[in-house]
Amino acid sequence: MSKVKLTRENIISLLTQAGEIEFEEDQIKATFNFEDFCGENLDSIKKMSITSCLTFLKNRQSIMKVVNLCDFTFGKITIKKNSGRVGANDMTFRRLDSMIRVKLIEETGKAENLAIIKSKIASHPLVQAYGLPLTDAKSVRLAIMLGGSIPLIASVDSFEMISIILAIYQDAKYKDLGIEPSKYNTKEALGKVCTVLKSKGFTMDEEQVQKGKEYATILSSCNPNAKGSIAMEHYSEHLDKFYAMFGVRKEAKISGVA
């Protein structure tokens, strides 16, 4: 009995015909590795400047809507609207987004680039929503990660601890962060990150634990309510007057804001 490729037509034959069918083993065992994918495809975005990468992240949702309208081609890469069964070598919007984040994080290794990224990413909506203080390279790297596919990025060497700590933080603070579980399951995302790390044989030794503590310290200083508090302070004088019209005094800060 000859083995056949795993295709739509052969799956239909498997389900509807009496003949014996087996699929090629090498195709079944083929798995996706984002780190390998990055290595093979980073050249496709090598011309993107730091500013362009940051513009992509800041406008991610709007860009995604345009890209997903139809087959989207840039250079030699095409993101198909209806990809069906996504192959290990196929580009998707999520993979593109993750590659851009990896590229930016690698750029933070240069002091000059770190300063540029730090100054520009501070205005990004998610950074403000998290109330993330940008004090050093690690905090800037966390800022770049916000809104990205953490399980994908976790597969890249040296990105393991930043990924798992951010996933833990999002799961622990999803209510404060305004994350809707029906739209983004933080527990499931954390499970995926752990699965990725286990599959690559990642060992959480003392050095990695120390790195994780540094990221956790930064995230523990986040203030998800800070953006609203700052905005209220901007209108403080007028808000006080309107509160007085209702016979009450405005609270100095939003509940939960230190």
Swiss-Prot record:
It comes from the Viruses. The keyword Glycoprotein does not apply. GO terms for molecular function: RNA binding. Pfam families: Tospo_nucleocap. The keyword Nucleus does not apply. Keywords: Capsid protein, Helical capsid protein, Ribonucleoprotein, RNA-binding, Viral nucleoprotein, Virion. InterPro entries: Tospo_nucleocap (IPR002517). The N-terminus and C-terminus are involved in homooligomerization and play an essential role in viral RNA synthesis. Homotrimer. Binds the viral genomic RNA. This is Nucleoprotein. The lineage of its organism: Viruses, Riboviria, Orthornavirae, Negarnaviricota, Polyploviricotina.
